[in-house]
Every structure is written in C-alpha cells, then in structure tokens.
Amino acid sequence: MAGAFFAGLASDVLGSGLGSLINAGAGAINQKVEFENNRKLQQASFQFSSTLQQASFQHDKEMLQAQIEATQKLQQDLMKVKQAVLLEGGFSTADAARGAINAPMTKALDWSGTRYWAPDARVTTYNAGHFSTPQSLGALTGRTNSRVSAPARSSPSALSNAPTATSLHSNQTVSTRLGSSAGSGTGVSSLSSAARTRSWVEDQNRNLSPFMRGALNTSFVTPPSSRSSSQSTVSTVPKEILDSWTGAFNTRRQPLFAHIRKRGESRV
C-alpha cells in the first residue's frame, strides 16, 4: 500500500513537472511569436507613416510650384496689359516697359511743372503728353505771307531793326522747307542764315508753348536758381510764371516772408 502511495506521488510529481515544462515552452514560443508580430507591425506602421509624409511633402511641393507659376503668369499678364495701355496712351516703348514694373519714367519739365513724357499722345494733359501738337504743312500752305521778305546778309543792327520773313506760317518759309526736303519750290539760299535761325527760334517758341500762348517767347533762358556762367542769358517770362512750377506755397506777396525765398524760386 505504501508502494502504491509512493508510486502515485511520483507520477503526480512527474506529471506536474512535465506539464510545467510544456507550459514554459509554449509560453516562450508564444512570446517569441508575439514579439515578431509586434516588430513587423511597428515596421509596417513606420513605413506607412514615412510614405504618407513623403506623399504629403510631394503634394505640397507641387501645389507651391503650381501657385508660383500661376502667380508669375498673372504678374506677366498684368504687366503686359499695363504696358499695352501705356503704349496706347502715347508713351515710348522704354517708358512703357518702365511703367509696367512701376519704375521711374521719363518726365518733361515746362513752365507748369513736371509731367510724364508721352510723345505719341493724342492729347496733351497736365499729367502726360508732349508740349503741343505740331501743325501740318497742309494747314500752313493756305496762309498768306504777312511780312516783308528777308534782306540779304548785313550787320546785326540791320537784322535786328529790319522786318524779316521769319514766320513759320508764311509761304516763303514753307516753300523753303519743301525745297530742302522735296527739291521743289524756293531754295534754301533764298533766306539768309540769320533769317532761317530766327524763323527756327520763333517756330520753337510757338510750338513749345504748352498752355499759355507766348509763354516761351524767350531767348537762351537760364532756368530758375541755376548757376550758369553765361552773362547773356535773359528771360522775358514774368516772375509769376517762373515761380509757378514750385510745389511750395508762394509767400512772395506776404510782408512777413518778403526776404525769404523758397528753394528753386527765382530772384529776378
């Protein structure tokens, strides 16, 4: 009976030990399998996250590139439209290109101030345009000569006292211009060089008057506040016109500012 007891006890101990070994081996195998599964899952998750980030970065890069190209095209189209408008308004090609990018454009200075230079403009305004529209030869040929013909070469006093055919509106001057260009009409030798020079000066004085008739009836005008070394410069323009281009308020007629002159104001 004691043998049977010990035999049963030994079988129980052996079975328990064998079961423990089996359970330990199965647990180790399960842990290894679970570790491998977790490692593969983490690798797959990292790979997916990296791929997603690369795709997102590539998408953002393409979108930014598309926005840059669209912005550049829009800016180019706007500059082309602005340049076309400036060209249509009479500005030169160089000034239209400058104005399309808001760069400084060529300005003209006359007795009324500065304005943008648009030589091909149809109308002269305060902001843009040329000085005046030159008169056509067809309108000039119908006018009659209202002055006496020019004398021959003589002394300067005789030229200054005697009336000469210096008007641009005379038939003789027009025929002289036609003769020099087309080879017909009165030759250039019909007028003396002094008479032709005086005719050219009067032509400039007439065509360069922007807003006031006779505003530029001047000879070798020295600009206001200039330091010209020439002593023969003279201006026949009134002082109000000389000072009209200054942007500051004109205090010339106020007693308190009698001895004060703004920068650029004439002292004649």
UniProtKB/Swiss-Prot annotation:
<dbReference type="InterPro" id="IPR004278">
    <property type="entry name" value="VP2"/>
</dbReference>
<comment type="function">
    <text>Minor structural protein that forms a portal-like structure at a unique three-fold axis of symmetry, following binding to the host receptor. The channel formed by VP2 may allow the delivery of the viral genome through the host endosomal membrane.</text>
</comment>
<keyword id="KW-1232">Capsid decoration protein</keyword>
<comment type="similarity">
    <text>Belongs to the norovirus VP2 family.</text>
</comment>
<feature type="compositionally biased region" description="Polar residues">
    <location>
        <begin position="164"/>
        <end position="178"/>
    </location>
</feature>
<feature type="compositionally biased region" description="Polar residues">
    <location>
        <begin position="132"/>
        <end position="144"/>
    </location>
</feature>
<feature type="region of interest" description="Disordered">
    <location>
        <begin position="132"/>
        <end position="199"/>
    </location>
</feature>
<dbReference type="GO" id="GO:0098021">
    <property type="term" value="C:viral capsid, decoration"/>
</dbReference>
<dbReference type="Pfam" id="PF03035">
    <property type="entry name" value="RNA_capsid"/>
</dbReference>
<keyword id="KW-1035">Host cytoplasm</keyword>
<protein>
    <recommendedName>
        <fullName>Minor capsid protein VP2</fullName>
    </recommendedName>
</protein>
<keyword id="KW-0946">Virion</keyword>
<dbReference type="GO" id="GO:0030430">
    <property type="term" value="C:host cell cytoplasm"/>
</dbReference>
<keyword id="KW-0167">Capsid protein</keyword>
<comment type="subunit">
    <text>Homooligomer. The portal-like structure consists in 12 copies of VP2. Interacts with capsid protein VP1.</text>
</comment>
<feature type="compositionally biased region" description="Low complexity">
    <location>
        <begin position="145"/>
        <end position="163"/>
    </location>
</feature>
<feature type="compositionally biased region" description="Low complexity">
    <location>
        <begin position="179"/>
        <end position="195"/>
    </location>
</feature>
